């Protein structure tokens, strides 16, 4: 019965999806990440700077959005199981006077079903560092009915969202496997360095049809923007977080490779790719 209800929910949230067309142009190449042979994953943007994360928790690489210049490399503790699949800046500052808001990063791993919150600091001389100030631990995937959790934050509404799959597969749509979106409250960093969620903390669950490989995600204006897929089989999906309905989906026109990170800059969607290309959308997205 539970499976029947889930399938019904999938059908309800996908009826009437607007097919639209969003095109992308390449704006620069992440030379440093590729030279270091880092496996590019989630990314986010703040203060005109792109913060690129990598698999295995390799250093965070910072680029100038104006010209793609490499600015610096932030050393963090390398951890093989940390995938860093999604990253998103909030609009919350740890302390008044901080240059950057808190950065939320999902480890997106069956064993590491958690996210970490970074405080990014910059000195007057321009040196940038990152410190983990909070760890968010989510229920076991089998308990919450969501595998490969990716985090996206809506700080304005006070929520965090996890996206993932109802079965332990990110590339097969069999057995009713579907994309899940779970809503949790967004805890304050003042609540402590470790927050453990349980299944009763799930405030809302939305379901959508299966799409291969959840990739970068971010929230703007009450809508979740997320890229899916790999080379030749990728798309951008916009979901209304008040209803769970998909507003539109589009092929990633102009992006031949695998999308990884997603952020916003000057009201445009920015997508970073596994091979180092950085793309900008022709779609204008207003909001915070």
Predicted segments, located by residue:
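Structural signature of eukaryotic scaffold interfaces centered on beta-propeller domains
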Residues: 39-46, 83-100, 145-158, 166, ...
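A short helix->beta-strand "capping" segment at the edge of beta-propeller domains
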Residues: 19-37, 197-202
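Blade-loop segments of beta-propeller domains
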Residues: 68-108
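Surface loop/turn motifs at the tips and blade-to-blade linkers of beta-strand repeat domains
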Residues: 30-36, 75-80, 137-144, 204-210, ...
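Conserved blade-ending motifs and adjacent loop-strand segments that build the rim/top face
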Residues: 245-265
